[in-house]
């Protein structure tokens, strides 16, 4: 039997047709196809890849994260039925970061490692300086356990920065999509540079891949990853991720689903890490997954 290649996926979404029916008709675009944990695992394993750690991240179009909890049960059933095939898979989850939803009970689930704020294309000026620091949010931060993190996603670096500055400094944070840097603005975009500086000052902020939303060309994304490594440190990058099922389009209007599947996404981050390694002399493996123990210890 061929030896499987071990992989970590620090950002993926699993959801069913039943999950999607809950939001059918309420979105301004076509719903994605269902993306189940079972199909994802089978496709990777059959391709010679062994996913050893997977983070099922809250899907922004859903009103809650019940799909994340359902995936925990799904894996448990798979492992009971076929421990040889699925027994080495570890699944964790990041749930919706809404104070009313992220209760003590939900955050206490042993597989929940964090909670996600989703702001999409919210402009910086729409984020008041107290939006994420009122009484309800402060109580939520207190409920986060020391190993858990707050996951922040916005399409503008300045929006990410405004949120980050409202979070207590002892709360660990992960910034999605490399801080949402923009290829056309370059690595000197003031807001992105300020975000890196804030992250360095705090010392407990990580930047997560896979990076193809910055550019689907690895060498271009690598410029930004190199800057993160130099500004914040190689121990603050979580590059190995797929963001499956690859919703949206790239800078040239091509659907990500036409460019990537999980295997191709892993190949993409490998290529990015190779470019960064040449520029920094940091080993590829460290760039890909060196910080994963801090994500899910």
What kind of feature is each model-predicted range?
Residues 69-76, 101-109, 126-133, 156-171, ...:
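Distinct, well-ordered alpha-helical segments
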Residues 8-12, 55-59, 87-93, 113-117, ...:
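Hydrophobic faces of well-ordered beta-strands that scaffold small-molecule active sites
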Residues 182, 186-297:
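H/E-rich (His + Asp/Glu) clusters that bind or coordinate divalent metals
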Residues 68-87, 170-177, 225-232, 258-259, ...:
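Short, electropositive alpha-helical surface patch
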Residues 66-155, 206, 211-215:
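Active-site gating/metal-coordination segments in enzymes
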Residues 36-46, 98-108, 192:
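Short, acidic/polar
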Residues 13-18, 64-67, 98-100, 122-124, ...:
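Active-site environment of divalent metal-dependent phosphoester hydrolases
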Residues 1-73:
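An N-terminally biased module of ancient metal coordination in phosphate/nucleic-acid-related enzymes
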């Amino acid at each position: 039997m061929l030896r499987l290649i071990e992989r970590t996926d620090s950002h993926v979404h699993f959801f069913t047709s039943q999950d999607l029916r809950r939001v059918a008709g309420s979105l301004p675009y076509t719903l994605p196809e269902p993306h189940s944990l079972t199909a994802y695992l089978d496709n990777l394993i059959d391709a010679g890849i062994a996913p050893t750690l997977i983070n099922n991240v809250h899907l922004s179009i859903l009103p809650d994260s019940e799909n994340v909890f359902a995936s925990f049960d799904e894996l448990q059933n798979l492992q009971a039925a076929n421990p040889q095939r699925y027994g080495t898979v570890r699944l964790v989850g990041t749930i919706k970061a809404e104070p009313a939803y992220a209760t003590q009970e939900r955050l206490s689930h042993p597989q929940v490692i964090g909670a996600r704020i989703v702001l999409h294309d919210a402009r910086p000026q729409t984020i008041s300086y107290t939006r994420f620091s009122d009484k309800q949010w402060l109580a939520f931060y207190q409920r986060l356990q020391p190993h858990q993190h707050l996951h922040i996603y916005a399409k503008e670096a300045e929006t990410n920065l405004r949120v980050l500055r409202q979070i207590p400094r002892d709360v660990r944070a992960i910034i999605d999509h490399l801080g949402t840097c923009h290829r056309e603005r370059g690595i000197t975009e003031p807001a992105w540079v300020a975000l890196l500086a804030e992250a360095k000052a705090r010392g407990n902020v990580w930047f997560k891949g896979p990076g193809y939303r910055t550019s689907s060309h690895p060498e271009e994304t690598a410029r930004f990853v190199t800057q993160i490594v130099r500004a914040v440190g190689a121990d603050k990058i979580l590059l190995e991720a797929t963001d499956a099922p690859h919703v949206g389009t790239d800078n040239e209007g091509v659907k990500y689903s036409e460019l990537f599947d999980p295997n191709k996404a892993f190949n993409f981050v490998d290529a990015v890490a190779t470019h960064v390694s040449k520029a920094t002399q940091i080993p590829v493996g460290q760039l890909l997954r060196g910080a994963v123990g801090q994500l899910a210890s």
